[in-house]
């Protein structure tokens, strides 16, 4: 039995997970410098111990409903192909151990977040967790 550890988080009422091996750290409202004329989903850049990190508004990137910045917002710092990227999310959940056999492929006939950016879907007692494909989100 192979286990996958997910860092789960929320954007509005939507629950998502990222493979914990991709997560470097989670920051609470770091200072962010806006970048003029950047894409609408780019929040700006932050200084992470001397490293410049681009911060993405994950709600905007996934074309989900905008939620106002709040005290529960967090920035998940991920490592993708030796580059650090920050993903701003509404709130963080838990680290969820998942049997890989319980992860289903995303539906092939669906557009939107699950069709474009999910590498899998996990059914839970409370609904579905979309497991994000970090490389697809950053492409």
Language-model regions: role of each:
Residues 1-139:
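An acidic, low-aromatic, low-complexity terminal/linker signal
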